């Protein structure tokens, strides 16, 4: 295993250059294997979990879901606040920011971004709760792709570009996650569900987040600094893939639902009209019969 790890490190060094020494010895960062194994186990559970739960009763998980979502809401709020203050104190340049130009502020950003990386491991629980509650319709290609890739991508980010221009996407994502996990936490309480109207806007916010990240990343390409260009190109490509998947999800979830509701409403309206027509016809027929009957009695 040590030989394999050494070979892997040599390969990464040849491909990406030397690692950032500021994160040497940090939990989970020295060796890629634990991150890879965690991701492989995650995908295995995604595959086997629904099969295991198929003939079993779903778990409620209500209490633990409230605690879990509250915890991630608070963690996301902490990361958002610390990243904003770290970037402000370090006088980060929006257009392009290197990884070694802000001193202690860079270290503050690195420490927060480690928590951001680690939060992606915690977020695997999102999927596990879906499996336990048998909400398999929520385990989409988008969901699995996003969760499985983010942990791995951020392992590489933390080892090579752990601050500087890397801050922007994480900052926006932390803000979105404050809204998202607070929504999930509240939706775990049945009495709160009628008041949760903003789910649609969370998805819209995620799409806006990806577009803004592409714009900010492109600034680093157009007005380059010491931040490696290869990472910027990768970021743009990854954001495009998320935009494509989230747009498809949005269309499937909201536009088709809206069209279905309109169709049902129109059908109901037509049925109502037919009922009125039939009622009128039946009443008229009844009146005719009544008149006929009276005539017959008179005769």
UniProtKB/Swiss-Prot annotation:
User: Mind telling me which InterPro entries this protein's record contains?
Assistant: ELO_fam, ELOVL5
**Record has Heme as a keyword:** no
Q: How does it sit in the membrane?
A: Multi-pass membrane protein
Q: According to the UniProt entry, which residues carry N-acetylmethionine?
A: 1
Q: What outcome follows a substitution of residue 219 to S?
A: No effect on fatty acid elongase activity
* Reactions catalysed, as given in the entry: a very-long-chain acyl-CoA + malonyl-CoA + H(+) = a very-long-chain 3-oxoacyl-CoA + CO2 + CoA; (6Z,9Z,12Z,15Z)-octadecatetraenoyl-CoA + malonyl-CoA + H(+) = (8Z,11Z,14Z,17Z)-3-oxoicosatetraenoyl-CoA + CO2 + CoA; (6Z,9Z,12Z)-octadecatrienoyl-CoA + malonyl-CoA + H(+) = (8Z,11Z,14Z)-3-oxoeicosatrienoyl-CoA + CO2 + CoA; (5Z,8Z,11Z,14Z,17Z)-eicosapentaenoyl-CoA + malonyl-CoA + H(+) = 3-oxo-(7Z,10Z,13Z,16Z,19Z)-docosapentaenoyl-CoA + CO2 + CoA
Query: What are the record keywords, sorted?
Result: Acetylation, Cell projection, Endoplasmic reticulum, Fatty acid biosynthesis, Fatty acid metabolism, Lipid biosynthesis, Lipid metabolism, Membrane, Transferase, Transmembrane, Transmembrane helix
What are its E.C. numbers? Answer: 2.3.1.199
Any idea what job this protein has? Catalyzes the first and rate-limiting reaction of the four reactions that constitute the long-chain fatty acids elongation cycle. This endoplasmic reticulum-bound enzymatic process allows the addition of 2 carbons to the chain of long- and very long-chain fatty acids (VLCFAs) per cycle. Condensing enzyme that acts specifically toward polyunsaturated acyl-CoA with the higher activity toward C18:3(n-6) acyl-CoA.
Q: Would you tell me the protein name for this molecule?
A: Very long chain fatty acid elongase 5
* Organism, scientific name: Rattus norvegicus (Rat)
